[in-house]
A protein has these predicted regions:
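Conserved phosphate/anionic-ligand binding catalytic regions in large, soluble enzymes, centered on
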Residues: 29, 34, 230-245, 414-431
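Local sequence-structure signature of Cys/Sec-based thiol-disulfide redox active-site neighborhoods
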Residues: 466-498
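Structural micro-motif
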Residues: 515-524
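Hydrophobic pocket-lining residues within nucleotide cofactor-binding pockets
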Residues: 178, 505, 517
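Thiol-based oxidoreductase modules, predominantly thioredoxin-like and allied folds used
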Residues: 497-510
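Non-catalytic, surface beta->alpha helical segment in thiol-disulfide oxidoreductase systems
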Residues: 527-550
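Conserved catalytic cores of very large enzyme subunits
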Residues: 1, 5-230, 251, 257-411, ...
Length: 550
């Protein structure tokens, strides 16, 4: 057993060091994001495991110990850091917080939350109160597009993308400039609509060009593993909503003010409606993103200040200008994390991708228990989909990891590197662009000891069984032509000699809408009371087959 552990750890260590090796243009390491499950997801639990391309006689739900072994090895290496004690920048791990997450003091839990407290490495996906499911990261090709006005969530975390999906391109709209130039609120919306129309057209043109290049064989690798850009989003984002509220002649208040929060909600809902219009007009997927704006927030503010000297940025005149990311609060607004969460929870849930709440901490949390408690509180009381705990730490070349922001080593007096999160990943503050460096100076970190939870536990959503009867008393299997899981579901049902009515979900849209089918494959099994039991992935379909044959 020790030999197996050592081999697993060696393999993962090789992977981690590999992805942190500069191999991109500009001698950069590739942006790498991985999603790790803490429990076996239900869309895979009942499927036979595949090892080396061959199906095994055991299921993924039987591999819990192997999951723990891989998770433990990964976290141990991330906690150890490199030879100088620096945390690894990549891969950025995303962990799923589900309703059945085990919060007990297990060895792996201690390691996970120690890593979070020390380096702030992981992202957490909130599957308790948000409208996401753990299977979303794998099921984009199975989603049905019945309502062209429906805006879908882009799965896969802050930097990553789920299987078979991604983004054609991103256009970020400069909100402060629109607000500064607008005479009144009506003029603001007219200017915003004009910019969004331009963004949508540009993304459509880009989609046409790269699709043509894909079809002509110029992207052979992409063609092999992806095949099509049909499930890719055309992304429109925004920057500087806080400064837009300050520049708006009818507001002149930042986002900590309730009037500005209401205006921001209205703006985001307006943008969502426009994206639905574009989906109908162009037939493509569009999404609203809280774009990271790592350099954009500084570049746009710098250009605006040159062109419009009286425009309000996040800093006073004479200081380096920058805009606050998307619809985030002013960086120096509060040290109470729950006050900030109460406001952001109402705004971030209106985006369909890119949104994340960073719990910026001045130093390492005192214990893994404190880290776990905070992660749990956020997941159980808020709806925002992604969040991080982001402690600041320093690195001395001689003495390694130092807690908090220390520009000189307290032991040897040498200059250190101060690390903090810049729009999603950790970098030495000394290497940030001028705008982000100014933001770091202005940033007020959250004091967990004095933060008070102000709201009650959200009602968690449950899956509701479809209760509409149909004349047919046979099983109905909703599939699509391109979904590989649909072929597997048909094969399993045929092999078990179970009769069913095959329904092409895309061709028979009326029936698909009638039964509110959201993804393929979905099996509807009639019950005695005339309603249907729903099995909406191949794993659950396989479980139904096995139980029906007992």
């Amino acid at each position: 057993e020790m030999c197996i552990r050592d081999r697993v750890k060696q393999c993962i260590q090789s992977f981690i060091y590999g992805v942190n090796t500069p191999s991109r243009w500009g001698t950069q390491a590739p942006f790498t994001n991985i999603t790790l499950d803490w429990t076996v997801p239900n869309d895979m639990a009942e499927l036979n495991a595949i090892v080396g391309g061959k199906e095994q006689n055991f299921k993924y739900k039987d591999c819990v110990e192997e999951m723990r072994l891989v998770n433990k090895a990964f976290i141990e290496i991330m906690i150890e850091g490199d030879a100088n004690g620096r945390g690894f920048q990549y891969p950025i791990p995303t962990y799923s917080i589900t309703k059945d997450f085990d919060w007990s003091p297990t060895e792996n839990n201690k390691l996970l939350f120690e890593m979070t407290a020390k380096y702030g490495t992981p992202y957490f996906s909130n599957y308790i109160n948000s409208d996401m499911e753990p299977s979303d990261v794998r099921s984009m090709c199975c989603r049905l597009r019945l309502d062209l006005r429906e805006l879908r969530k882009k799965s896969g975390g802050f930097f990553g993308s789920g299987e078979s999906t991604g983004s054609i391109g991103v256009v970020t709209i400069n909100m402060p400039r629109i607000a500064y130039l607008a005479k009144d609120e009506t003029d603001f919306y007219e200017r915003l609509e004009k910019m969004m129309n331009l963004a949508a057209r540009s993304l459509k043109i880009k989609r046409k060009v790269i699709t043509r290049l894909l079809d002509e064989g110029l992207y052979p690798y992409t063609k092999r593993y992806l095949g099509t850009f049909d499930n890719h989003f055309s992304t429109i984002g925004l920057v500087g909503m806080n400064e837009a509220c300050l520049n708006a002649k009818w507001l002149k208040k930042d986002l900590s003010n309730e009037e500005s929060q209401i205006f921001t909600k209205n703006v985001l809902n307006f943008m969502r409606e426009k994206l639905s219009d574009y989906q109908e007009q162009y037939g493509d997927l569009y999404n609203l993103e809280a774009t990271p704006a790592e350099s954009t927030s500084y570049r746009l503010a710098r250009h605006d200040r040159k062109q419009f000297p009286n425009i309000i940025t996040a800093t006073e005149k004479g200081n380096t200008p920058y805009y606050t990311n998307s619809s985030h609060l002013p960086v120096g607004f509060t040290s109470d994390v729950f006050t900030a969460l109460d406001i952001q929870d109402e705004l971030q849930t209106l985006y369909t991708s890119g949104t994340v709440f960073h719990v910026f901490l001045g130093q390492k949390l005192p214990s893994w228990e404190a880290s776990a408690k905070l992660v749990r509180k956020i997941a159980e009381n808020y709806r925002l989909p992604y969040y991080t705990l982001s402690p600041t730490y320093s690195i001395c070349q001689s003495h390694g990891y130092l807690d908090g922001e220390q520009y000189k080593c307290p032991i040897c007096g040498r200059k250190t590197e101060v690390y903090s999160r810049i729009t999603g990943y950790y970098r030495p503050v000394q290497n940030w662009n001028d705008g982000k460096a100014e933001e770091f100076k202005n940033r007020k970190t959250y004091d967990i000891a004095t933060s008070v939870l102000h709201k009650n536990h959200h009602e968690t959503s449950c899956n509701v069984k479809h209760d509409e009867a149909n004349d047919a008393k046979e099983l109905m299997l909703f599939t699509t032509k391109t979904c590989p899981n649909c072929k597997m579901a048909k094969m399993l049902l045929d092999k078990a000699n179970i009769k069913y009515i095959p329904i092409d979900a895309e061709e028979q849209k009326e029936l698909t809408k009638k039964f509110a089918i959201r993804k393929a494959p979905t099996l509807l099994v009639p019950k005695q009371d005339g309603t249907y039991e729903t099995y909406d992935n191949v794993s659950l379909i396989k479980k139904y087959i096995e139980e029906s044959q007992k």
